[in-house]
């Protein structure tokens, strides 16, 4: 089982409370600020030099990797990775971003990573929260994941067709509740076509009737997915949810959902089990 200490638990409770709090726009939070921080983070991933982040960091910032608070210089952020794909979503209400990145071309350091970056009221980064999947992670194959991701279209949704952030989060929560709630699947706004990328396993076949429903849980008495942290981007119809995947070795988990016209279109998942092979 993955270890999960009290200090980490307290921090994640705080992050969850922050994510669920009534959102408010900070005077200093705009796209320029969020893009600058996301770009600096990606530059750090490439270089492996964590000190380059210093100008944008709050004095009390925390680095969380796979649900554990650690020294950033010992984490994946310091490994100097080749970035073959990245996409960043922007949550102005929470002054936060979510970045999906894939490093597949260096076979010695394959990773698929999700990152939530949060800013304080002064605009400084006070939290970098990462789910880093790699060898032994659930259904992991960075090369296959990359091949599927580049086929998808994550265009900005026209303003008049965007779902409200509450609806986007509710869709993600309903999906995440299916393991512990027998009726949760009824609240998921299933769309067609819809494709799920679970690690490197893809439900899409390029057909109009592609569905995200194959393989959803039939056992609803499993442990819940807890300590959820959210980044919501209405322009992309997306919610990123980080959590503890309790029924699979207390794994560190990332689920991202995209809604189009109120219906589920894409699901991306990453699940990491403390360096051990993930097993149900």
What are these regions (language model features)?
Residues 20-280:
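C-terminal and inter-domain tail/linker signature
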Residues 1-27:
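Fungal secretory targeting signals
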């Amino acid at each position: 089982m993955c270890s999960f200490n009290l200090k980490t638990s307290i921090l994640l409770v705080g992050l969850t409370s922050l994510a669920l709090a009534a959102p408010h726009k900070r005077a200093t939070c705009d796209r320029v600020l969020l893009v600058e921080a996301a770009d600096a983070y990606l530059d750090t991933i490439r270089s492996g030099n964590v000190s380059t982040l210093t100008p944008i960091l709050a004095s009390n910032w925390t680095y969380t990797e796979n649900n554990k608070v650690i020294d950033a210089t010992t984490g994946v952020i310091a490994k100097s990775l080749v970035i073959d794909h990245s996409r960043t979503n922007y949550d102005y209400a929470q002054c936060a971003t979510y970045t999906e990145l894939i490093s597949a071309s260096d076979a010695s350091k394959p990773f698929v990573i999700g990152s939530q970056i949060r800013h304080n009221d002064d605009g400084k980064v006070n939290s970098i929260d990462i789910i880093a999947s790699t060898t032994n992670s659930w259904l992991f194959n960075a090369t296959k994941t990359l091949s599927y991701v580049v086929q998808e279209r994550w265009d900005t949704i026209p303003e008049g067709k965007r779902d409200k952030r509450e609806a986007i989060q509710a869709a993600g929560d309903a999906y995440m509740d299916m393991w512990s709630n027998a009726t949760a699947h009824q609240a998921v706004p299933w769309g067609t076509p819809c494709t799920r990328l679970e690690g490197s396993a893809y439900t899409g076949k390029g057909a109009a009737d592609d569905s995200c429903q194959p393989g959803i849980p039939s056992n609803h008495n499993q442990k819940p997915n807890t300590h959820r942290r959210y980044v919501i981007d209405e322009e992309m119809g997306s919610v990123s949810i980080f959590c503890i995947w309790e029924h699979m070795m207390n794994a560190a988990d990332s689920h991202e959902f995209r809604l189009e016209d109120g219906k589920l279109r894409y699901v991306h998942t990453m699940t990491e089990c403390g360096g051990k092979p993930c097993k149900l």
